[in-house]
């Protein structure tokens, strides 16, 4: 899927251009993306590539445009300018699990893809997230972590080329969050989608990502490869990029 949006004459030149280092095919490519809300520019001539199998974490202060970018990639928000080349229907997992309370777990997982996923595919996806045998259970019987596991199963049930994660672990307790991190890493390695994780948690980004981006004023301001730094050194760098004094 390619979406082109007319570029306004006053669009700024991108402040940061990424050079791909991974030979895998692109899962998504963004060029010159711009989004305005009235006079306020939320995304400013942004460029971004994510490759198949690459896990990218996006950090930034509240209001810098992270979620707006994710929604644009998901097709939930139309930019004012630029181009998006992305799978026609990427999968999205939000902070809230968004399960339908009147539908069983397998029906929630297969929602919108009943023909291609079906009960059998939903059962396999639920088994992958540790909920085997609970296909006919109801969302009301789940803990917060279990409900988010179902949301993740729904996101991966049809093997998407692009998986978008909008702070999916933010509402979970610390222990459940750690368990979910391990599960996500395992599932991404198995399914091999390109992943964009929007998060405020530097440590979460360090744990999960192959590449960490910092967004500032609607642009990608910095990009880091975790393997080129020690975790402690990169943590300090990222906190400084975010305007936080590290201890």
From Swiss-Prot:
Residues 28-242 form the ABC transporter domain. ATP binds at residues 60-67. It is an enzyme of class 7 (translocase). It comes from the Bacteria. The keyword Translocase applies. Keywords: ATP-binding, Cell inner membrane, Cell membrane, Membrane, Nucleotide-binding, Translocase, Transport. One of its GO terms (molecular function) is ATP hydrolysis activity. The complex is composed of two ATP-binding proteins (SsuB), two transmembrane proteins (SsuC) and a solute-binding protein (SsuA). Belongs to the ABC transporter superfamily. Aliphatic sulfonates importer (TC 3.A.1.17.2) family. This is Aliphatic sulfonates import ATP-binding protein SsuB 3. It comes from Paraburkholderia xenovorans (strain LB400).
């Amino acid at each position: 899927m390619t979406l082109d949006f007319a570029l306004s004459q006053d669009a700024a030149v991108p402040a940061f251009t990424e050079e791909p280092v991974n030979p895998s095919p692109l899962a998504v490519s963004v060029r010159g993306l711009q989004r305005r809300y009235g006079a306020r520019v939320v995304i400013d001539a942004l460029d971004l590539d994510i490759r198949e199998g690459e896990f990218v974490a996006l950090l930034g202060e509240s209001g810098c445009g992270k979620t707006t970018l994710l929604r644009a990639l998901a097709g939930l928000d139309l930019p004012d300018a630029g181009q998006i080349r992305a799978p026609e229907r990427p999968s999205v997992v939000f902070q809230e699990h968004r399960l339908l309370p009147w539908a069983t777990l397998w029906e929630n997982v297969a929602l919108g893809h009943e023909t291609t996923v079906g009960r059998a595919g939903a059962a396999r996806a639920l088994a992958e997230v540790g909920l085997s045998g609970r296909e006919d259970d109801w969302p009301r019987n789940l803990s917060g972590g279990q409900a988010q596991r179902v949301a993740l199963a729904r996101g991966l049930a049809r093997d998407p080329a692009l998986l978008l994660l909008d702070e999916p672990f933010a509402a979970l307790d610390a222990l459940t969050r750690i368990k979910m991190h391990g599960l996500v890493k395992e599932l991404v390695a198995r399914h091999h989608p390109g992943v964009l994780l929007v998060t405020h948690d530097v440590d979460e980004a360090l744990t999960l990502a192959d590449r960490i981006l910092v967004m500032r004023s609607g642009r990608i301001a910095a990009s880091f490869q975790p393997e080129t730094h020690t975790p402690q050194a990169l943590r300090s760098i990222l906190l400084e990029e975010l305007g936080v004094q590290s201890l």
